[in-house]
Amino acid sequence: SVAGRVGFAYRIPYAATKWAVIGMVKSLAIELGPRGIRANALLPGIVEGERQNRVIEAKAKVKKVSFEVMRDEILSGASLNRFVTHQDLAEQAHFLCSPLGKNISGQAISVCGNIEKAG
């Protein structure tokens, strides 16, 4: 999760575990690299889908705004102004596992639309 790179208000334990995953991946890359094994982490931002729609609906209800207004507010934190899709994540994973990614190891790769804050 991108929460391993940015702050996540009211979700400190979650964010802390995501920072830990980055350290784990970097350590695994050092340990396993001599055997030709690569380790990387994908850090998704806000992933489009039903789960995210429920989160947006709940936040909209609390703030007494429409779904669309809440969605736009959430997306305003990402410079690309769009959600990540499952396909985006799959394509990045495929690239990393392909011969094109053969020299990429120990990296925490954000797939997040340049989101500046989580939550």
Task: Map each language-model feature to its residues.
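Active-site loop immediately N-terminal to the catalytic Tyr-X3-Lys motif
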Residues: 6-13, 34-35, 81, 99
